[in-house]
Amino acid sequence: MDNIQAKRYLLNKTETIESTPFGPDVSVFKVKHKMFATLSLGKGNEKGTNGKMAGHYCINLKCDPEEAVMLRDVFAAVIPGYHMNKTQWNTVILDGSIPQGEVERMIDNSYMLVVSKMPKQDQQSLLMPL
């Protein structure tokens, strides 16, 4: 999955909007004003990443803490969330090593984790089209 496919998939989630509150280099994706993903191009100088993000688009995704650790163990391109709570967020490096379906599943899970914390009325309106 490349950055264009990722962005398209993110924006296809019900009521998702994109904004750039951290500047033009970081796209933030929110549902009902709650962030569930960011997308940015790694520069290689990100502290604590050993240059893994260099030249690759990366998505920060919310994740169940136990699954977050498991995904990091399985995929070298999944690291603790850069600039995020490392217990509940992963950074997925879009370097082609993770199957597209798996990246989509991680995006879906992030979206659903955020939606599940919303009031029931909001949850119902968001999940109705699914």
Question: Which residue ranges define each predicted feature?
Answer:
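Charge-dense, helix-prone N-terminal extensions
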Residues: 1-130
